[in-house]
């Protein structure tokens, strides 16, 4: 197919190559016809930074930015590239990568914190907008927080009040973001051999926020220069995200809004109506309700 260009001569995206969806293809072509700039056209026009794509540009201090591009002929012998502070290409790449991990973990985990705060508010009966919709899921996750679901009465086990269980789970769940000691509770959900491997390599997260903060600390100028140690902290923060903030958000949302189940629905650009004001809500933040 011939290269597409707009009236100014800028390269345009091929609608068929940009998306497999016919509706999206149609609207990309329409946007181009109307002269509307889209992400697809900008991607076709913009050449990625050759140094940035290798992760070897450091902007962590005011002496830089330092660029350590690979020589065109490659590296023969020892890699002697260093930034002004002495950071190697490996160190710079590791710093940049784990800062991206910190950003992603912060976004995921702060979503989970918001859910936990709403859950706590619902458990305290501070709002009528949210209630426990899936008590069975609450009973299923309670043991992971060392919350008893039954109480002994005259030698017989009786079910505890669901509101009492919810309040105790909520308080302990919210504590996972900033507790001073121990490790994340949900780590024990992993298969035992995997958990032991995490413990042996020293990457068990202590709490969610601490691992994100420690990445920002270690990647600051004059702190950690060992790329292996930096990547180790990146692993720890990733586990804090996946087995902490994200998993807590999933479970608490299930309790608050009901555990999801498969359903059939229509979803595409064709659901929009020409004679209506179309409002599209996108995302996975149910507490916006």
Predicted regions and their residues:
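Metallocofactor- and cofactor-centric catalytic cores in central/energy metabolism, strongly enriched
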Residues: 2-289
């Amino acid at each position: 197919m011939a290269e597409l260009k707009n009236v100014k001569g800028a390269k345009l995206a091929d609608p068929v190559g940009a998306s497999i969806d016919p509706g999206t293809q149609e609207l990309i072509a329409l946007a181009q016809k109307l002269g509307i700039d889209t992400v697809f056209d900008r991607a076709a026009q913009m050449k990625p930074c050759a140094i940035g794509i290798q992760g070897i540009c450091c902007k962590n201090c005011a002496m830089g930015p330092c660029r350590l591009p690979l020589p065109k002929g490659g590296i023969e012998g020892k890699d002697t590239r260093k930034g002004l502070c002495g950071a190697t290409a490996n160190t710079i790449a590791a710093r940049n990568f784990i800062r991206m991990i910190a950003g992603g973990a912060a976004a995921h985990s702060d979503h989970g914190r918001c859910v936990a705060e709403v859950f706590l508010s619902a458990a305290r009966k501070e709002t009528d907008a949210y209630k426990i919709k899936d008590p069975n899921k609450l009973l299923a996750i309670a043991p992971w927080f060392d919350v008893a679901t039954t109480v002994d009465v005259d030698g017989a086990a009786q079910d505890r009040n669901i509101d009492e269980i919810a309040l105790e789970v909520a308080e302990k769940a919210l504590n996972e973001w900033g507790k001073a000691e121990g490790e994340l509770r949900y780590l024990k959900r992993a298969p035992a051999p995997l958990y032991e491997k995490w413990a042996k390599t020293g990457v068990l997260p202590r709490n969610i926020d601490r691992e994100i903060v420690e990445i920002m600390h270690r990647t600051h100028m004059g702190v950690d220069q060992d790329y292996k140690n930096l990547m180790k902290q990146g692993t720890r923060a990733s586990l804090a995200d996946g087995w902490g903030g994200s998993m807590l958000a999933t479970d608490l949302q299930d309790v608050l809004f009901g555990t999801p189940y498969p359903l059939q629905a229509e979803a595409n650009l064709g659901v929009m109506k020409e004679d209506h004001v179309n409002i599209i809500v996108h995302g996975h933040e149910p507490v916006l309700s």
